[in-house]
């Protein structure tokens, strides 16, 4: 789709606008220049001054170069270029302004080449307003001048302005080049990622395809990254699949796209393809971070260990983002002690490293330990970020540390100047709600200074599910249905609450509403790794004939556990059925299928690790406790909220999840 009404083109009028101070350069005397016997009047002096300035710039002696500049009336373009580059890398804004003033006084400000360099200089110094002014005063705007401004504005986060200027540039007939498309594609995600920005990105995709840039590896890689940031995995995959040439950056972009958008299997598959197909280049640190993220998502411990070994062999174990990703990977694979050892061996730590460790302890339910690490982080001089508080407040929630969580929430703004965001309020509502302090949770939502979003109302509805508060659940669900009419999970959660309260007419009403809106319940799915291979299991009401062995094993196992005291918990079944039929349904839950497969295919004493995409239900939680006791198995289950470590009939969550 193309713009039906392109922006109106206003032909610029040019006026002399002085945005720099008009004071002549009167620097202190330069002993280097004045004492140089080669400097004398005439052409020889000009050559010597230019050469001296260039030499000083190359040596990083900007102050001295500027002093010599005051003695030179006609610096060459190369001299100005080196001065501008030196200013961008080493100077204060005042030095840059002095060089710019000399260019203006010398009448060289309309040189498009120097204008391009000046815009880049001001961008590097973080002075985007000066960059705009240089652009506005430049009459002959080549594509390089436009690109320089696009780069400056994109880096400064002014994506909307870049896109507006891009359409204007097209209207006046300036041809884009490969750098133009790179900058404007990045501009699409420089601000908030909205549907409007996505549509503009698709239009730019069409433009560059028509103009023959669809085979350029760098542009296509940027396009993959743009679609990834919008969550358009299929578009990104299509672009990547059509690339005739791929480099390590393009492979890394596609792997990151899958890893960040919940496609961990595809991320690992793409990494394997990369290792087979790339001969001239090896995966870099960016690749490793994304692959480790995929391993963490699936709790693929054995594959994560292989990646760790590769990182060590490649010497990437000194790069902070890689080490932080390793800490997270081991934590989310249930090997908290290994993640701690990796962290302890770090020579340098940044806030991301600390956040990784805090989050790892939090997801295992060790709230007190997470708080201890948080305080250790502060003692080491690291400043917390909003992500830090999400991690530590989440840790408090999983262990029920209400007062500690409230204290930390209060310190965010008071001690650290961090304004609580929606995510922090959602953590607090979850903390209070899990502790059955639903009135406090509801009051916090009511007193919020910003509009509560789906995360906050979702936390409240989840708490109502735990404690069976129908009235508050109805209030929260009404807001969620308005905010997220297409999120089937909210309808299912309300139906669960009604089912546990035996309110079957209301269950039917919610199910009809779900069907009327064309929504489907997200099926429960589990993953597990056995001998370095990943297996996936989906909840079904009717058993798959291909899983007859697992089915038969489960039926026998359930009968054995019943003899030992196991009573199936069927309150959450959304059907008004006979007890036997309900038991058959809960026996088909994905975590039970994965558990049975693990019992069949692992040796005695070998732990079973399962990852689930939803909250662990009460029946599966109880069933797994019985299995861990009577089958003498250690079983680790990571659901959407936290880790459950089952051993000898006891769960590490203390039945608080």
Swiss-Prot record:
**Residue spans of the PPR repeats:** 45-75, 76-110, 111-141, 142-176, 177-215, 216-246, 247-277, 284-318, 319-349, 350-384, 385-420, 421-451
| Origin superkingdom | Eukaryota
Give an example GO molecular function: zinc ion binding
Q: Which residues form the signal peptide?
A: none
Which parts of this chain are annotated as the region Type DYW motif?
563-657
Its name, as the record gives it, is Pentatricopeptide repeat-containing protein CRR2, chloroplastic
- The transit peptide spans 1-51
What is known about what this protein does?
A: Required for the intergenic processing between chloroplast rsp7 and ndhB transcripts. Necessary for chloroplast NADH dehydrogenase-like (NDH) complex-dependent cyclic electron transport around PSI (CET).
A single GO cellular-component term on record: chloroplast
One Pfam family here: PPR_2
Q: Where is this region: Type E motif?
A: 456-531
Into which family does the record put it? Belongs to the PPR family. PCMP-H subfamily.
Fetch the Gene3D superfamilies from UniProt: Tetratricopeptide repeat domain
Phenotype of the disruptant?
Abolished chloroplast NADH dehydrogenase-like (NDH) complex-dependent cyclic electron transport (CET) around photosystem I (PSI). The double mutant crr2 kea3 enhances the kea3 single mutant phenotypes, and delays induction of CO(2) fixation after overnight dark adaptation.
Tell me the compartments it is located in: Plastid, Chloroplast
**What is the native source organism of this protein?**
Arabidopsis thaliana (Mouse-ear cress)
